[in-house]
């Protein structure tokens, strides 16, 4: 079959740009990338056949500059532009500009984007077509006092949502009327910053709902079908964490009803291309239209894995005027697929986005059952300007239980050194009963977050001894290698066993874990050690380290661990949990906390959007002092203790670096 286009420009970055390039390459299509100053060495730039610079690192200076992207398309001879997701993917003006330039926009018609791009307008349209809606307000009057009245009429709990937004940006849950004004102002700021549109809609908040969406596809010949559902109920801060298909909640009858509603929604706007109709689903099975995303979704790979399709190829062919490759009756799903999003973020700090160089990155080996969609590689930098996703991990197997087990095995091979990551959080997620039993709802993670975090409890003793053995073997191997380079491989000084004249041969391994510092006394050499820590002894025999595979007998019981080391970090994984330690000098003292409680510092680079702190004002612990924007999210910085504001060293609009002191406190 002939390629639908000879040259396609991808107006995006990261993993989605890389993913589109792979399909184009398979079809023999020449690819053109665009990049910001921050992405000059990014993977999508390296993968494309050619690449054009389009501006500064901030999205509004590059990936949101439609004219710069069109200029790159004209210069490169691109026949079509694939927008990916985010950025300009749901921008009707850009889609229209592409058409006027004679360049195909690989997405829906501009009027379809406009109809569904405003949540308020979309809800009005769905209301006309009989699609169930959650009670609320989606009108044009955006006066604050009027919205407060509509909120009171709708009732609490209430959801405030950006009319033109998505992805959790500009969204707040309000449980009491007195919280409404502050929540509205914060959501409006976030929406204005993220989408250039501060309009809000109000909805009655459905308690403990599920989030289930349907993939739809239409062509220019009037055909519209759905490609089954994806359940995305596992969310944190309104961001999807785990997506799967089929949904463990839907019955065949519910699936048929929701699928028909999704197709009706798409037909209502003469939809062409890939889209997703999202529903809120109550615990009783009732469902309500939430929004339609007029683009390819991040989680589309689970649909591809169960159907054996390439949705990007479908997008390309439909954009070229071809009919849909399959009819509704031809859609046959096979097995179960799950996707997880691996992020540079700190779950223990409210999922604070991270940034920095990926000093070490290990991801699962791709196979027929395991897929990895990544936009970065080891040595790349996760920047502060964009979403901190590292990779998407997708698995497929015959049923849900097998798919979950395959995902656990895939996660066990992951390692991220550099910025903090959510890999350990994901490991706990796929073992949690709420997930394995298929009963999670959209608010479960936020309500029970402590169940998914490691906490500050005692370190596992077996893991501590395994980490110590890994350090011992690593030191011995390094000493032997050095001796060989020196031409004396049999020197007793190269044994790294602690032997010295007049010395008993004890080595001390100091490891910092969640439970504090541990010292492990070790006697022995070459895989046979007598270990002791905090009065507990362990005899280790037959220890070997083959690459990252550590095997040994601990007090006669054979164990196998995955052990990795990078710099002073050592991590061991027993197949169920990972345990990380910092290998410290055995007799080093820990630094004290100093005056950390007297300062409020920037947790990461970002822009100050609001300053509430005033010099001389007495504040209480937890009071809101500043709001900053980083990684496209608003972060509220609060007083670490009660006191008097002594100094304010930040102003709205100012860009600050990580660890910059923003507020100083004195005693009240």
Place the predicted regions along the sequence by residue:
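Structured functional modules or segments
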Residues: 589-668
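Structured, non-catalytic alpha/beta "coupling" segments that mediate domain-domain communication
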Residues: 90-97, 339, 349, 441, ...
